[in-house]
């Protein structure tokens, strides 16, 4: 999978390494894959990680599926999913009371199974809600966005009501 974006005009000066580590919060393991495979391109060319990115630069990140093997999940029922929001990276659904977020046993069916069937590919639990709790729950639609979302959620404080 490839991701491309353009450095905006209002972007602060930083290196490729700082861009991936501090701005996009890409974890060390994923940065390692990107660096060793030379899968970070700036304006179509590989670049030294200490090189600065410039306003208007085209950044391309290439992720190999082999680095992120998909888990096999039993199929769920997509009609049980109430979608609240979805984009290319995440899906947010309403978890009903009485349904587990994820299974404890390999053959058990839970919300994760239903969401994965709804999306058409394996999704990943970003956070969970207790079985008896209903509410919005976030799933990552690919394995390389999951640790980024986890790092963002770690920085957020919240209060149980």
Describe each PLM feature range.
Residues 1-161:
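RNA pseudouridine synthases
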